[in-house]
Swiss-Prot record:
The active site is at 63 (proton acceptor). This is Peroxidase 64. GO terms for biological process: hydrogen peroxide catabolic process; response to oxidative stress. PANTHER family: PEROXIDASE 25-RELATED (PTHR31235). InterPro entries: Haem_peroxidase (IPR002016), Haem_peroxidase_sf (IPR010255), Peroxidase_pln (IPR000823), Peroxidases_heam-ligand_BS (IPR019793), Secretory_peroxidase (IPR033905). It catalyses: 2 a phenolic donor + H2O2 = 2 a phenolic radical donor + 2 H2O. Disulfide bonds join 32-111, 65-70, 117-313, 195-227. Pfam families: peroxidase. There are 73 peroxidase genes in A.thaliana. Induction: Pathogen and elicitor-induced. Up-regulated transiently by a cold treatment.
Amino acid sequence: MNAHMLNLLVIVIFVVSFDVQALSPHYYDHTCPQADHIVTNAVKKAMSNDQTVPAALLRMHFHDCFVRGCDGSVLLDSKGKNKAEKDGPPNISLHAFYVIDNAKKALEEQCPGIVSCADILSLAARDAVALSGGPTWAVPKGRKDGRISKAIETRQLPAPTFNISQLRQNFGQRGLSMHDLVALSGGHTLGFAHCSSFQNRLHKFNTQKEVDPTLNPSFAARLEGVCPAHNTVKNAGSNMDGTVTSFDNIYYKMLIQGKSLFSSDESLLAVPSTKKLVAKYANSNEEFERAFVKSMIKMSSISGNGNEVRLNCRRVR
């Protein structure tokens, strides 16, 4: 091997190694060893006053990673003529940003300018799951914060009306597999959905059916009572499953029973491969948790274009 080829090989090995090592659970071991603990405390405190916080943080993290990668861009406020992601239509109902603000404030007091807002959100999402009775995991850290946040880009988020082909494409564009899709959909075990997210299944479903025939009839009737065709009740909707504050596999059990809310949930039963995974997770909470952790680490490692550590998560430096 000549010297030129050897040097090229060294460069390639270095670049690949750098990418692999870019995120690490030990990233703050020496610069801010208490980072995880500080974020956990902020989430715990918020949860003691508001049981909707875990679902909010988990959803916030998903929405961050699916637009520009996991760079904390969903946390930025709109400014001037720029309408930020958090004010895009799919994100209007996002809340609990104050939890990230509180964690950031505490971290800045202990480790000024060290921990990124993107990492704080990733840690908070992990804590949201763990503190709701779900699994915990070592979060790879080292993300940088992005400087761009545009509401129009929230169109890239998977919609609750997506079919399985649209979901496959949407997740695939982010390097996520169908296994990841089914596992991450289990995050719907936490939280609440507004009527607008599933009205399409209850009223004028298609030219032949008024209501989606895959819905359990009694379940559909209950939803119609909450979400009539001309609903005027602000924030009307339904819990995502029967144990809204517990992270478990009830979501999959309800899905099999025809009691899911979103068309995108029901679409997981449309093809044999994903239907098999739904059944697997419905039958074993342990299998679900194992798959969820693996897919969460994968999703939260989607690289963004961030290059700074914000001092305030709502605005760039």
